[in-house]
Amino acid sequence: MKKKIQIITTLGPSSLNAAFLKFSNNNIDLLRLNMSHIEPEELEEKIKFIRKFTKTNICVDTEGAQIRTKVFKPRDLKKYQNLKISRVKDKKFLSLYPYEIFEKLKTKDILNIGFNNLLIEIKSKKNNLINAKVIRAGKLENNKGVHIENRKIGINFITEKDKKAILIAKKNNIKHFALSFTNSSKDVEKFKAILGDSCQKIFKIETKRAVKNFNKIIKNADNFLIDRGDLSKDITVVQIPKIQRKLMEIKKNFLKKKIFIATNLLESMIENNYPTRGEANDIYSSLEMG
């Protein structure tokens, strides 16, 4: 019987080892390398290491159109605490990547950082520094996603780092790529033009704009991934089940196309040997949707 369920696993510090990679040979369909946490200079070495132990296909997942924090040391921030944001990477201050985003930020912008609900408001901007104030306490850590609450800011659909990574990956015969923060059918077409016809592409749905444009996006590609984590930064958590069901309903009109579901499927198993009843129900319901 042909296997209908496919599993993508992200390789991180705890799974990028010989034992897990050998296990992946018969249990996992695609091994994901997240370029948000890998430098292009490291990529070739990681690919070669993976291939020593497994024949499972590797997928290079781009950073895409996302803002991220750059800090040298994590720290807890209290409500009403003042904070400075630097135009460029700085040991003393928070900076934001891609660095050109500094130019687009305005007074009264609200930045939602990471998944621990840290909120900061921009109070003033002068030369190479922004003065901000914490309006909801939380932990400030490096390389965490930043969502601008009050308005949309245009960002290039892939970064210069992504372009370097794609060249290195293609040189190493990688055939699977994912576009993070796909927002429109134009993003799909641009990504396809960069990669060519010989590569498999997964387009990640993780913004309100992508949900709105999904009817058009799905017509131009074959593989999609609903990232419920980043999507929950753009819509409320209580809307996630409804949105997931809506996207799966649209997919029913395109039977040969695939949708993967990501985030919190088996979160409790970081600490426990078995999933919770809620997680089991979530996975079953997702599969039942198609």
Language model: regions and residue ranges:
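Non-catalytic helical/linker scaffolds that mediate oligomerization, partner binding
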Residues: 1-290
